[in-house]
C-alpha cells in the first residue's frame, strides 16, 4: 500500500512529516509513502509580516489543494497553521505526539525575558507574540522577523537581533537537545501559545473511511484531546493572525487545564479553566476571552 503525502519543503516540515509517518507505520507496517513537496504562499512571500499578507491559511492552502485534486492522499501540517475551518471536502484526521507547546526567548547568549537589556531588538512577525512581549517588556524594541527556523536562528547568531520569540517545538525538532542558540521557555501564563503549537496534523479527503480510521489509530491520544479543545477555542474565539490571542490545553489523567490569553494596548489578560470535555472547555475559554476583549475595546 503506497500513500502520497503532500507537505511543505522546509527542513522542519520534512522532519515533522517523517515523524508522523513513522507513527502511521508503527500501526500499519505494510504502508509506504511518497513525499510531494508543495510551495505555499507563506513560503513565497517573505518580505511582509504574516498579518499583512491578507490571505487565510498561507501555510496550508496549497498543500490541502494537492489532496483535493487527488495529487496526494494526505496533507501534513503544523496544526497551528491550520485555520479554524479547513477547505470543504477535507477532514482533519490525525494528530502526532506533541512537542513542547511553549514559546521561548531565543538568543545567542541566553537571555530570558527579564534579562533582556533595555532597548534590545527582539524579532517576531507574530502579532500575538509582539503584543504580549510589549505588555511584559515595553522597554524593548520589536521588529519583524520572517523566514524558516534555520533562517531566523542564523539571523540571531549573526547579531542582527538580540533575541527572537519563537516556538520551542520547531527548534527542538530541528536541532534536538543541543541547538546552536539558547532557549528560555515562556510559561503559558505569561505568553499563551497559539492553538495547536507543537502538534503535527494530517488532513485527508472526506469519505476516505479506511484512511481516516488508520490515522485515528495512529494518533496520539493526549494530543488528540488537546487538539480538540484548542480547535474548538480557535473556532469560537474568531481570531486570525492579526489578533493577539493564544490558547493551549494540557490533558492529564482525563482532566483538562486550558490557559488562554489576549493582549492589546500594552495590557495582557490571561484566564485558566478546567474541565473534562475538550469541546466544552475550549468553548468556555473562547467565551471568556471574547468577554475580556470586549471589555477593553
UniProtKB/Swiss-Prot annotation:
It is an enzyme of class 2 (transferase). InterPro entries: HemC, Porphobilin_deaminase_cofac_BS, Porphobilin_deaminase_N, Porphobilinogen_deaminase_C, Porphobilinogen_deaminase_C_sf. Keywords: Porphyrin biosynthesis, Transferase. The modification S-(dipyrrolylmethanemethyl)cysteine is found at residue 241. Its cofactor is dipyrromethane. PROSITE patterns: PORPHOBILINOGEN_DEAM. One of its GO terms (molecular function) is hydroxymethylbilane synthase activity. Pfam families: Porphobil_deam, Porphobil_deamC. SUPFAM superfamilies: Periplasmic binding protein-like II (SSF53850), Porphobilinogen deaminase (hydroxymethylbilane synthase), C-terminal domain (SSF54782). GO terms for biological process: heme biosynthetic process; protoporphyrinogen IX biosynthetic process. Binds 1 dipyrromethane group covalently. It comes from the Archaea. Pathway: Porphyrin-containing compound metabolism; protoporphyrin-IX biosynthesis; coproporphyrinogen-III from 5-aminolevulinate: step 2/4. GO terms for cellular component: cytoplasm. Its EC number is 2.5.1.61. It catalyses: 4 porphobilinogen + H2O = hydroxymethylbilane + 4 NH4(+). The porphobilinogen subunits are added to the dipyrromethane group. Tetrapolymerization of the monopyrrole PBG into the hydroxymethylbilane pre-uroporphyrinogen in several discrete steps. Belongs to the HMBS family. This is Probable porphobilinogen deaminase. It comes from Pyrobaculum aerophilum (strain ATCC 51768 / DSM 7523 / JCM 9630 / CIP 104966 / NBRC 100827 / IM2). The gene is hemC.
Amino acid at each position: 500500500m503506497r500513500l502520497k503525502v503532500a507537505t511543505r519543503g522546509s527542513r522542519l516540515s520534512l522532519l515533522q512529516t517523517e515523524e508522523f509517518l513513522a507513527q502511521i507505520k508503527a500501526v500499519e507496517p505494510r504502508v509506504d509513502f511518497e513525499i510531494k513537496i508543495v510551495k505555499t504562499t507563506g513560503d513565497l512571500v517573505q518580505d511582509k509580516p504574516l498579518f499583512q499578507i491578507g490571505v487565510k491559511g498561507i501555510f496550508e492552502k496549497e498543500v490541502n489543494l494537492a489532496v483535493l485534486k487527488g495529487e496526494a492522499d494526505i496533507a501534513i501540517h503544523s496544526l497551528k497553521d491550520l485555520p479554524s475551518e479547513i477547505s470543504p471536502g477535507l477532514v482533519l484526521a490525525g494528530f502526532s505526539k506533541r512537542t513542547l507547546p511553549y514559546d521561548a526567548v531565543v538568543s545567542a547568549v541566553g537571555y530570558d525575558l527579564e534579562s533582556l537589556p533595555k532597548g534590545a531588538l527582539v524579532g517576531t512577525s507574530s502579532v500575538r507574540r509582539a503584543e504580549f512581549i510589549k505588555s511584559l517588556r515595553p522597554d524593548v524594541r520589536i521588529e519583524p522577523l520572517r523566514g524558516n527556523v534555520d533562517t531566523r536562528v542564523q539571523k540571531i547568531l549573526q547579531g542582527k537581533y538580540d533575541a527572537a520569540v519563537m516556538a520551542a517545538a520547531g527548534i527542538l525538532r530541528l536541532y534536538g537537545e543541543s541547538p546552536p542558540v539558547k532557549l528560555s521557555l515562556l510559561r503559558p501564563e505569561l505568553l499563551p501559545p497559539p492553538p495547536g503549537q507543537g502538534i503535527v496534523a494530517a488532513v485527508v479527503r472526506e469519505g476516505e473511511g479506511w484512511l481516516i480510521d488508520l490515522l485515528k489509530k495512529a494518533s496520539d491520544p493526549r494530543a488528540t484531546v488537546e487538539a480538540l479543545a484548542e480547535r474548538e477555542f480557535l473556532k469560537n474565539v474568531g481570531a486570525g493572525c492579526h489578533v493577539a490571542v493564544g490558547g493551549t490545553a494540557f490533558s492529564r489523567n482525563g482532566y483538562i487545564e486550558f490557559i488562554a490569553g489576549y493582549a492589546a494596548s500594552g495590557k495582557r489578560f490571561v484566564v485558566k479553566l478546567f474541565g473534562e470535555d475538550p469541546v466544552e472547555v475550549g468553548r468556555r475559554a473562547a467565551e471568556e476571552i471574547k468577554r475580556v476583549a470586549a471589555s477593553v475595546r
